[in-house]
Amino acid sequence: THLDHTSAAAQRDQVAVINRVMRERYAEASKPVFLGGDLNALPDSGTLRALQEAWTVLTPTDGGTYPSHDPKKCIDYILQLDNGVTCETAGARVLHRFEAGDAARASDHLPVLLEIRLPAES
């Protein structure tokens, strides 16, 4: 997911569609539903608050993800739809280096990693 980076009004419209469509399609899902990406929204922004009406942020918000060479802003996230399905977060972090090398050279955003334990099949 990539939200608009220039207009708060456009972000509001995008979030309204995401929340509505995902709730309609996955409210009765038996598995967790995730949303991840460059949301171009700071942790205390209206955009993230609007997303949190339907989603729970699972990745850290206290460190930067952008720009990758000097990450000062957290604008990249992984969220879980609040549809009654739970999963355990086993770990979540921003990656600065990984096996392929320096993350700052791969993108202008640092990757976020989420490790989960899925609920047992019933």
Placement of each model-derived feature along the sequence:
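Surface-exposed cleft-lining segments at the edges of enzyme active sites
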Residues: 1-11
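Catalytic metal-binding/acid-base residues of hydrolase active sites
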Residues: 2-4, 39-42
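Metal-dependent phosphoester-hydrolase catalytic domains
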Residues: 9-34, 40-122
